[in-house]
Amino acid sequence: MTQTKIIPIFPLDLVLFPRQELPLRIFEPRYKQLVDDCMLGDGQFGVCLIDQSNLVNGWNAPKATGTIAKITKCEDVEMDGLQLHIETVGRNKFQIKKIIPPSLAPPENYDPYTVEGHNIISELHEKFGTGEKMYIQAEVELIPEIDDDISLEKWQNLVSLWKNKIVTQALPQVVELHSLDHVLEKYYLTTDMPTVDYVYSLSALGAKDPNDLQPILESNTIEQLLYNVEKLMTVK
């Protein structure tokens, strides 16, 4: 039987890949509670792309496949403690098996960017009980890593597709190929020994929308991964 566990979920407008670094500024009370709980536990939560077609108790719902984020640093932004800055790094991918809704629905006209919004949520949280979780949780199943190697030939093909996509999308402006080589150098993507992580990073460079990266994250075999990245890089 496959083992599952319950983790906090942070829906975001981005896709986090394994071993990628992700800095976040935390200001909403529900996500400050999430970070506080993580710091008291194993320092891990799930990052999922927002599912624009669904809500969970009135809040943005997560896509079903995400990545565990491990908090590596946490500090207050200001002395008032209203904002936190955390640094995280991606770990395993996971599949959501069951959503556990948050205790609170968003209040009418709730604005998380204001002090008033913070006060309203805090008052509601005290009313419902401070032991209740304001954030989404989920029962998740961890997804095994892709262990297969990527041949240099396949990697060079992906790089060529990426370059062609950038050059074509820039028209009528001319993009010199050597400038794209500099971009690859900047992101440490010049290699003779490519790995899955290189493919993830190149995909991020080739995507205009985070939704374009979700199929990449959902790829669980090397064949699926290469197919979806080639599809992403192909100019339509």
Language-model features: locations:
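N-terminal low-complexity, acidic/polar interaction/targeting segments
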Residues: 1-236
